[in-house]
Amino acid sequence: MKLHFLSLLIISTLFNCKNDGNNSEGNYAYLGGEIKNPNSDFVVLSKSDVVIDTIKLDSKNRFLYKIENLESGIYTFYHGGEIQMVLLEPKDSLLFRLNTFEFDESLVFTGKGDKKNNYLINEFLENEIQEKKIFKYCQLNPDTYQRRIDSLKTLKLNKLKAFKAKYAPSSLFDKIAHANIDYSYYSSKEVYPFVHYGNNKGAILKSLPKNFYSYRKNINYNDYFLKEHYPYNSFLKYSLNNLALENHTTHSNNDVFKRSSLCYNLDRLKLIDSLINNETIKNKLLYYFTANYLLKSTNTEKNEALVSAYLNKSSDETDKNEIKRFAASLNNLKEGGTFPSIKIVNYNNTEFDINSLIKTPTVICFWSNTFYNHFKESHYKLNELKVKYPEVKFIVINVDNYGLDKPKAALKENNFKLKDEYQFKNPKESLETLAIHPMTKTIVLDKYQKIVYSNANIFSMNFEEQLLGAINRK
């Protein structure tokens, strides 16, 4: 691995030397990498939702790419369903290595531009850990909670100050790093009433100090520069949840707040439409909240009402068509309905219609190499359930479109048996038909191939109760 990266670095340096004389402005950068356990044979590079190029991996799963006429800023590379951001500035020669089984955790940058990008990825990972602490802190009273998160913000600012003193990064990096700290902090404030114990969220909001959300007056909800930044996008979602809640409590007669309330979700779409003017940001948020509602709802009439509101507000025709197809797929998976005919293949490449396998109460689960931790944890859980419920058939389907060899190897490497393991014959079509999102989605059927639960989760506290309901159906 080190030898591979040394060779990449030498190649990058040679390219720099060769081209510096022909590009006096130095308005270019190199991005290269090596991917262990690749999910495909290419990476996609983009900026601001515009694809720059699709780059093939070589025989050693490496690539090196020169970006001409570089516009300094955040670039995105996609590989096998995973996404990573990198900050590129003129004359950067940035190299990375990663393992798809632990995408973010394994990502390491080297070369010119590595310090700032390693700082940003480490900050992202630290924020993921810190988020769990913040959810615990949310049970504190508002003043104590404020002091805790203020302290965390101060630590981050001190760390950034030390980094700047040592490496003297650009003003662009400084802008991004400060925005990440600020918006992570603001998210901590916005999430408080939702995570704080108690169902009367309106009362919790009223109990907060008057200046608790004073920063909002300085927030730009249409910041095009930050539109692809994770902390900013997370903040927007938390803040819109909160602002919609404030509005909802003014006309709701129910003290017990329900996130699944159609009224609340319609309030939120209306708020997005009125507050956000940038079409890109607005359309993404409208899509996100509409899809999220549909995933958790089994009420067709309410789904239609929300979809109608969404279609009237979004200007993205591609997104609108996706939402319509998604809603139609969910409608076809109504509880009590017949499971659709789906072709699957086992690891001997034998094809089946999935309904031909359903003769007893059945649980259908899904996994992907992209979500490797979920793959392992779900199989451990399924092994437990198979022992406890021998009368239930468990069908486990890999949703990837990489052929049989890669998922088969993953199963064998982890000592998981191949019995009852399958792949979709037509992954793209089947994913859409079954509306598989998130990957934890589990479908429970009775022995008559009727859908009992279309959106269960083997990790939920009431899953075994749901399973017993399917078993005991007459």
Regions found by a protein language model. Give the residues of each.
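Short active-site neighborhood of thiol/selenol oxidoreductases, capturing the structured segment around
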Residues: 352-382
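Thiol-/selenol-based redox modules, centered on thioredoxin-like
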Residues: 444-474
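Structural microenvironment flanking redox-active thiols in thiol-disulfide oxidoreductases
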Residues: 373-414, 426-431
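Long, charge-rich alpha-helical interaction segments
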Residues: 223-296
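N-terminal "domain-start" segment that seeds a small globular fold
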Residues: 319-355
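C-terminal motif of bacterial Sec signal peptides marking the signal peptidase cleavage site
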Residues: 13-16
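Short, internal strand/loop/helix patches
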Residues: 410-447
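A non-transmembrane, solvent-exposed segment enriched in polar/low-complexity residues
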Residues: 19-172, 188
